[in-house]
């Protein structure tokens, strides 16, 4: 944990901040990075110690900030939390874009995703599973909204649209436990690329396969992932 310098928070929903305070209380060198509006949302919505603020390091959308040797730019995403953001992370020549908990692909999301060699993007639900599943109608409507979550098929079309040889790793994240499975998400997202003739690696060893055009992985919902070694495609 000594090498970890900060925790970047996308928004104030409980599944994104639940363990942040317990981590920084134990490892006091770690800062909590979020927008001031997101911090206010966290303090308002959750039963959390006021000392949470002691670890706060503010940032603002579209204004780059630094954590150690990483340059980070937060950008707007469409979700129903408070001041929701994704992150564009730069380290040397490496570019990593993260967008999770978003109901649609906005121009700002697209702007940063197209610059990255590595992307982490939500692939939350399979539409048929959601519509025939046990969720109440109001919850289905929330998920389907433009400030809800991304359907596997939407993510698949978007990745197929933006793919270029420089894109080496795609991480699918925030998969629903009730309305999705890793196999369904991967099958849906990889199919358009297969149809275009691209070779897809699964990143199973945590390293880039030089036989594949791109590595696509579905990240686990509840467990830690393996450690991935990110290397840009030399194409």
What are these regions (language model features)?
Residues 4, 53, 116-117:
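Short, well-ordered alpha-helix to beta-strand connector turns
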Residues 4-12, 33-35, 97-101, 120-122, ...:
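Active-site neighborhood of phospho(di)ester-bond hydrolases with catalytic His/Asp-centered motifs
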Residues 107-218:
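Cap/insert and terminal regions of metallo-dependent hydrolase folds
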Residues 1-38:
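Active-site metal-binding motif and surrounding structural segment of the metallo-beta-lactamase
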């Amino acid at each position: 944990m000594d090498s970890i310098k900060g925790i970047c928070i996308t928004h104030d929903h409980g599944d994104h901040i639940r363990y942040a305070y317990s981590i920084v209380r134990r490892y006091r060198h770690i800062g909590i990075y979020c927008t001031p509006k997101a911090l206010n949302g966290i303090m308002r919505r959750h039963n959390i110690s006021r000392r949470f603020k002691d670890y706060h390091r503010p940032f603002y959308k579209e204004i780059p900030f630094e954590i150690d040797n990483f340059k980070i730019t937060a950008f707007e995403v469409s979700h129903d939390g408070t001041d929701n953001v994704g992150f564009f992370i730069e380290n040397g020549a490496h570019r990593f874009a993260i967008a999770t908990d978003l109901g649609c692909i906005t121009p700002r999301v697209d702007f940063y995703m197209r610059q990255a060699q590595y992307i982490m993007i939500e692939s939350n639900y399979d539409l048929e599973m959601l519509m025939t599943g046990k969720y109440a109608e109001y919850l289905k409507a929330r998920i389907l909204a433009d400030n809800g979550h991304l359907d596997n098929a939407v993510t698949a079309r978007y990745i197929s649209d933006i793919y270029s040889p420089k894109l080496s790793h795609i991480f699918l994240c925030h998969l629903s436990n009730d309305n999705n499975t890793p196999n369904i998400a991967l099958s849906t997202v990889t199919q358009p690329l297969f149809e275009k003739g691209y070779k897809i690696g699964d990143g199973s060893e945590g390293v880039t396969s030089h036989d594949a055009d791109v590595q696509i992985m579905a990240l686990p919902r509840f467990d830690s992932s393996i450690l991935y070694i990110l290397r840009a495609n030399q194409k």
